[in-house]
Amino acid sequence: MNHQQTIEELAYRSGEQVETCEAVMKAYEKYAQHHLKKARRNNLEEVAQAVAQATELEARICENILTQFFDLLAERISFFNRRGGK
């Protein structure tokens, strides 16, 4: 699954626009670069809040998209469930 397919799948699952998903994932990538150990499902509320501030979107929208992202990762990468991603 390439980047565009991932974004389109997140849009489908979350019910949000493709552009919104793209913005959230771009902000999440930047957040993860600086907070690698925090950028996981265990810290979903904190991550969503940081992404919301960066994108000026509502935190609930960011949390929804990030939840769908973590679910997608768990489905596609079998060891992800054992590493604290879910």
Regions found by a protein language model. Name each.
Residues 1-86:
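Mobile acidic interaction elements
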